[in-house]
A protein has these predicted regions:
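Conserved small/polar residues in nucleotide/adenosyl-binding loops
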Residues: 153-155
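Short, structured patches in soluble enzyme cores that scaffold and shape functional sites
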Residues: 108, 144-146
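Positively charged, polar, low-complexity stretches
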Residues: 4, 9, 13-17, 21, ...
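A short, acidic, flexible beta-alpha connecting loop/helix-capping segment that sits on the rim
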Residues: 147-151
Length: 155
């Protein structure tokens, strides 16, 4: 989808850095959060949507609905869309389903479970690292950058 101006992995999904730094940086007017669990949680979805400042629309979709929406090219004509998910596994699946993503920004991924630190504020488990390698094999430019004012770390 040509309208995706930022595809980002961030396990906090939406927070102040996204709204105050990334949205203005890429001039986004729409955010699509792709998360099956959050999409089913009506309360959490509502809270996330209500965080949107004027002029920004936030959607919370499970992966099936996100795939449908992102494939509907006319549905976001003229929009500048940020797509956010908690894991690179989600983006690997979106690409398998035919969604075109050229670049993937890996932002905050905290240490938990089997995750090990791989960069500042970024930790991955073996499956997530494998997904990153698969994305790179599919010619997706994957990089670490927590905020736009910091330099990119290319993978």
């Amino acid at each position: 989808m040509k309208n995706i101006v930022l595809a980002r992995v961030d396990d906090r999904l939406i927070h102040t850095e996204i709204l105050t730094l990334w949205v203005p940086e890429v001039r986004a007017n729409r955010i699509i959060i792709v998360d099956d669990v959050v999409a089913k949680d009506k309360f959490r979805s509502k809270v996330i949507k209500e965080m949107a400042p004027q002029g920004l629309i936030i959607h919370v979709y499970g992966i099936d609905r996100a795939t449908e929406k992102l494939k509907e090219a006319p549905s976001f004509d003229g929009e500048r869309v940020i797509v956010i998910a908690e894991s690179p596994l989600v983006f690997e699946e979106l690409i398998k389903r035919g969604i075109k993503i050229n670049q993937l920004n890996i932002g905050g991924m905290g240490i938990r479970g089997e995750r090990k630190a791989v960069a500042r504020r970024v930790a991955c488990d073996a499956m997530e690292m494998e997904a990153i390698h698969e994305l790179i094999k599919k010619h997706v430019h994957v990089y670490f950058q927590t905020v736009p004012t910091l330099s990119l770390i290319h993978i």
